[in-house]
Amino acid sequence: MLYNRLLLASNSKSMIEKGMKSMRRDYNTYLRQFHEAKWDEEIIFDLSVPGQRGILVPQPDEAIVEEVGNGVEDIPITMRRKKAPALPEVHQMRVNRHYMRLTQEVLGADITPDISQGTCTMKYSPKVQEHLVSQNPNLVDVHPLQDPSTMQGILEIYKKVEEMVCEISGMDAFNFHSGGGAAACYTGACVVRAYHESRGDTKRDEIITTIFSHPCDAGAPATAGYKVITLMPDENGVPSLDAMKAALSERTAAIFITNPEDTGIFNPRIKEYVDAAHAVGALCYYDQANVNGIMGITRAKETGFDIIHYNLHKTFSSPHGGMGPGCGALGVQEFLKPFLPVPRVEFNGKDYYLDYNCPQSIGKVREFMGNAHILVRVYMWIKQMGA
C-alpha cells in the first residue's frame, strides 16, 4: 500500500512537471506551447457503473427526524419523482479523471486569451458565431467612419438587438457603446446625474448600494464623483428595509443594486427598496450581472427599475474574453432616453441612420459605437433560442 502511494506520488509529480512544460508560455510570441490530448473521452453517462458512488449522502440524526420528520413527507405527492433520476453512477477518481481529460481535450480551442474570473455566470459561446464574426467580410471589413448607407446590415442588427433586449427587460431604449459592465455602470451614473440636473435637482450626490451587489455598483458611481453608501446585511442575509429607508434622503441620486446578489441569492426585498427610493425622488439602477438565474421569469420593468445594464458578453452568449472585448448594454425607461450617449441608431421607415441630434445626451462615452461583433453574436444566440 505504501509502495503504491509513493509510486502514485512520483508519477503525479512527473505528470505535473510534464504538464507545466507543455503549458510553458513563449514570451517572444506570448503564446502557450501545448500538446493535444491523445484520447477521445466518453460522455460521463457511458462511464456509469451501477452501484458506484463518488460520495455517500449524509443521513440526518434520529433526533432531528423525530423533531421535524424525514422531509419527504412534506413534499406534495404530485411533486415527488415516480422513479430515481437517471444520474451517472461513477466513483470519485473516475469523475476527476473524466473532467481532467475534458479540459485537456479543449485546451487548444481558445489558447490565446487567459481564462478570466467573474462573479457572474457565463454562457457557452457557439463556435459557429466565432466563425462568422471573424471571417465574414461584411463585418470584419466594415469601418465605423464609412457612410451609414454602406453598412445598413450592421446598423439593422444594432436596432434589432435593441428591440430584443427591450422586450426581455421591459425597458424602452438601450445603448451598446460601453465596453463592459463596469463601463455601463459608469455611463448609468452619468445618466442619473444628467437627469437630476435637467430638473434643477443638483444636491443629489449620494448613491446607495449593498455589500453583496456587484463591486462596480459602488466603484463606478464613486468614479463618477458620487458619495457611496454601502448597506450591510441583517440576520436574514440582506439589508433590512429600515436600513434602506434610514440611508435614503433628499441627497440620494439613485440606488445601485445587483439581484440576484453575488452570493447567488435573490433579494426578496428588492421591490420594497425600489418603492422606498422612488418615494424620496431617487432613481433605481438594476445591475443584471447575475440575471441568468431569473432570465425569462421576471423583468426589471415589473420590479420598477428605471435604468439597468446587461453584460452581453456573459448573459447573451458572447465570450468573456479575458478582460475583453465586451459590451455593457445600458437600458432605460422612456423618460431617461434623451440622456443616452450618442449616436443612436434609428430607422426612418426606409433606412437606418445615426442620430446625433440629442441635445440632452451625456455625449460619447467611447470611440465609435462599441464592439459591433458582440452584437452579431447576441443576435444569433437570441435567434437560436427561438426569438
Task: Go through each PLM region and give its residues.
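N-terminal glycine-rich, Lys/His-bearing helix-loop that initiates the first secondary-structure elements
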Residues: 2-141
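Conserved PLP-enzyme active-site core in the AAT-like
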Residues: 5, 152-153, 183-352
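Gly-rich Lys/Arg/Thr-decorated short loops/hinges at beta-loop-alpha junctions or inter-strand turns
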Residues: 79-80, 135-148, 166-169, 222-232, ...
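Short, hydrophobic/aliphatic alpha-helical segments
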Residues: 95-111, 161-171, 310, 353-360
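Flexible, glycine/charged-enriched surface loops at secondary-structure junctions
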Residues: 110-116, 172-176, 288
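Phosphate-binding active sites in nucleotide-utilizing proteins
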Residues: 139-145, 149, 154, 173-177, ...
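Short loop-beta-helix segment that forms the pyridoxal 5′-phosphate
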Residues: 163-190
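Structural motif of enzymes handling amino- and sulfur-group chemistry
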Residues: 352-387
